[in-house]
Amino acid sequence: MCGMEYRLKKGSVYEGKVEKVDFPNKATVWVTDEDGQKEKAIVKNAIPGQTVRFCVNKKRKGHCEGRLMEVVEKSPLQTNPACPHFGKCGGCTYQTVAYKEQLKIKSTQVEKLLSEVVSGELPFEGIIGSPVTEEYRNKMEFSFGDEYKDGPLALGLHKRNSMYDIVPVTECKIIDEDYRKILTCVQNYAIEKELPFQHKLSHEGYLRHLLVRKSVKTGQILVDIVTTTQIEHDFTELVNRLTSIEYKGTLTGVLHTFNDSLADAVINEKTELLYGQDYIEEELLGLRFKITPFSFFQTNSLGAEVLYSKAREYVLSGGFGDVAGSKPVIYDLYTGTGTIAQMLSPVASKVIGVEIVAEAVEAAKKNAAQNGLTNCEFIADDVLKALDNIEIKPDFILLDPPRDGIHPKALEKIIDYGVDRMVYISCKPTSLARDLVTLQERGYKVEKCCCVDMFPGTVHVESVVLMQYCGK
């Protein structure tokens, strides 16, 4: 095998068929060498059944890793892409795969990952699809840059495998017409005014990102132009252009955020309100939520209703153990803007949400008040620190951490509460699998689990796990 004999040479190009694709989008490609021996390579961004050409760029124990160069033969699963940006843009790897097959791929990936770490037979309930497969995004972060080195200004998404080149995505299929109009308007304005974009290597330039949020239920739209402070510019004319566009929804706010950080991310160092209000409102499962530019909120609103309904079902299944007959105290850790906390409010005596982003916590408090909920408390702090200071103990814990999962020390503190049951929502199955190992070692058993597709066309998927404490 490659990891022992290194038959496949680094820098050389090979051709092979994709046998399977594991999360996160790692395809197993088998290559027959000149001696007739089969060797394995891992190649990203491929689809089961494709014949691909790739260049070996890394060697690992037991296999090589390669960079996809060309699809020599399509997979039987593939159709023609609906989006003209497919292949250039870095997203929507599975767009050419029928949605039913996408769900099979994702479900198989999650089931395989969890089966490898869960003790006994995996109680896997399969996957639930998104109610919509196109125009489902309620938030987009576009980047300013150029399509090629020293080219004209472009506004869009990063080209696949590139941190520098930008693909204009005016016909993107996961955003609706209003996003496309805003994207075109802002790009044309920037070109006309000859505003320079910030170069990622030199960190010189002005324009960095365009953030757009749009509510599915209310149709409210929020636009945020993110720049450095290297130039002073009056955006009044751009605001006038944006407000004169005929939208399906309603433009309720335009913001200008200043960000001089070196990181290639939208970071709020200072924000000015140029027009309207600095938030939009979305409705989920009968509750209304204010969403600010930088607060976390699931990017597929209709999919979020499916995800949270399943999480709530898991929370309510089996009662609340020792607190049966009375309402439990529920911890919602990594609560974001408090969406799940508020959905659990009717069945709890108290819900305590913890979130490190202060802006999100303020939004959560306002949302709870707006929804008439008096038993929700939200704390702005890191979970690891906050757990030392909360006096009231939980009867049930809900976990919805960021992609990298739960800090090991925080996970130990969570386990030490000894609650009868927990629900873990994860947007990265590999992180979930790692944390489940620790949870099982400390006495928890997976009662049931499933996944929910929130991101059609992409490689991403959400997972939900219900755990029961069974003792060490």
Task: Please provide the spans of the model-predicted regions.
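Rossmann-like S-adenosyl-L-methionine
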Residues: 2-10, 15, 20-27, 230-472
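Short, acidic/hydrophobic/Gly-rich beta-strand patch recurrent on exposed beta strands
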Residues: 27-33, 156-159, 224-226, 364
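Extended interfacial segments that mediate partner engagement and assembly in macromolecular machines
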Residues: 70-81, 90-196, 217
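Internal alpha/beta scaffold segment
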Residues: 164-208, 229-255, 262
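Short, aliphatic-rich beta-strand segments
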Residues: 212, 218-228, 288-292
